[in-house]
Amino acid sequence: MAFALKAILRPVGLILALGVVFTTQAFAQPVTQPFTFNISSHDLPAIHHGSANWGDFDADGDLDLLLSGSHGEEISTNLFLNRGHNGEQHRFDALTGPFHQVLYSASSFADVDGDGDLDVLVTGSTSRDWPYTASTRLYRLQSGGPVEYLEGHGIPDMHSTAMAWGDLDQDGDIDLVMVGVTSDDVPTTVVAYNNGNGTFDSHTDVLTGIGYGDVAIGDIDGDLDLDMVLSGASDNGFLTQILRNDGGSFSAISGSFPPVAFSSVDLGDYDGDGDLDLVVSGGEVSELIFEGSLQIWDNIGGSFTPSSHSMNGILAGDVTWGDYDHDGDLDLLVYGAEAAIGRRSARLFRNDADDGFVAASLLVGGVFADAEFGDFDGDGDLDLITTGSSSLGPSMTNIYENYRQVIPELPGAPSALVASVSDREATLSWQAPVGTDGLILTTYNVRVGTQPGGSDIVSAMADPQSGRRFITGPGNASVGEAVMLSDLQDGTYYWSVQSVNNAFLASEFAVEGSFTVKGSLSVDIDAEDTLPRRFAVYGNYPNPFTSQTTVRYDLPEAASVQFRVYSLLGQEVHSATLGTQPPGEHQVQWDGRSNGGSQLGSGIYFYEIRAGGSSASGTMTLVR
């Protein structure tokens, strides 16, 4: 039976009705540990029906703020530059620019053109009342110049949106998935592939159309491509889907996922087992008209099982992971309305491995709300911004400063970078930093460029020298220790990777590696003669070397490949399993470090490459 989406879900219907009947107090329960956050004084506009995003737009070392939504009788979109504390108040200066004013909005920072700085995408309605006028605009920061509106970007106009970024087609640049509603009240899911020049190739007919919901992107099944989670209202009812990426096409995996709308989803490895778990919260029809629900799903080998953790659900708000207490694992913020006629709440749940999630701090609740963690004051811990409507007023913007006394150290950099190249594909892998055995409490952030230190192929949205990131959240490679790139052009590429802990603090980048793509070796009748006829390993280059050397080798047929390094005494000091590789020319790099990540001393080392039943070896000289 068709679902009457237009009748009950447009903002002048259910949304405004909800806004009238939310009358209970924003908070009432006691906390279970000393209060962690204090509200910071500021002069930012109070916002509801909008979004808040942290990002170092001007690359000066602190997080700026992008706000959009309803501000009193006004509609507002502004970028505020972080100027630090000014007496008793934190100062933000509004950036004069071409931003269009929207509500029922979503916005985000992303480096869409690979130039190393942050661009801005803003979607929403330019009109407060129905029929809504949907609008989507993309803005680019010109180097040393003003903010520029990019016309012809190719992303559809939508409102009541949510968005997520990631390299869906593995070509290096960042693509977009967006859910929302068009001006014609059609729920729509957009998959927009980045053309690399500020324009996108958008598809609206490949996935179920979703509105009034949320989307998240991540490698759920560990196969080195990005999958997605969709949740919200479709023309056929509420739904939540997990979609696996199979070579660019997406298929739903089985599971009894909750059918919710006005929903929020987030991916994160809360149990530290090396895969992405899922939290889903949103509204479902009940005796209370519309009631919030929440479920955490454990990822077990790419399949999802509901966890035993229990907490009140929310709708028209946000659930988000972040390590606010600096113990290494992911905690959870649950922020929104518990029911259509019910309390607005904002709870921080502390992740205690033995005791599950413990309600730790209670903040000012809200609805039509957004929230984001970020270290806006630069003291090394996660602060928090929330927006929405509360019982204290129709609009609010609260910034909470985290006053935890224990500040974590920056994570260590990854080591043992290896690039495996075949045809026009490259698999880049690394080893976790020293001291991260056991629970996996880091994600990884990769950069790839055509010049040393560059990021024009894969943008890390971070400073290549210090490693300081321009955005908050997990790294672009998530919890995996490898990424794959395809359709690479001939040439030499330079790459590195950094660790990102669950408080979103990043290490320096690892010692830079490089690899070379030398044209296609695809097998067909006319091209078979270009494939190697025998297994061969060539001398490393450079030799002697100080920081990194490359060993090239040929495979006449597909084989499982291993790379090992031995000292003069025959002790294995480094090993890497490169997986099954196709026939063709390949290379592997070594940075002079042990498996544990420590630098080895100067001297002569033996290397060996094994491929199936074949092996070959050589010597290399490391000079420190």
Name each model-derived stretch:
Residues F27-I47, L81-V102, Y139-M158, Y193-I210, ...:
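Blade-edge motifs of beta-propeller repeat domains
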Residues G50-F57, S105-G114, T161-L168, G213-I220, ...:
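Beta-propeller blade termini
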Residues Y403-A416, S514-N540, P556, S615, ...:
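Residue-level detector of functionally pivotal "anchor" positions at catalytic/ligand-binding pockets or at interdomain
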Residues Q405-L439, E508-G519:
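Pro/Thr/Ser/Gly-rich low-complexity, intrinsically disordered linker/stalk tracts
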Residues T427, L521-Y541, F545-Y566, S575, ...:
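Glycine-centered coil/turn sites that cap beta-strands in beta-rich domains
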Residues L441-L488:
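Recognizes extended acidic, P/S/T-rich segments that occur
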Residues L485-L505:
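Beta-strand-rich modules
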Residues T580-P583, Q589, S598-R624:
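C-terminal tail/sorting-segment detector
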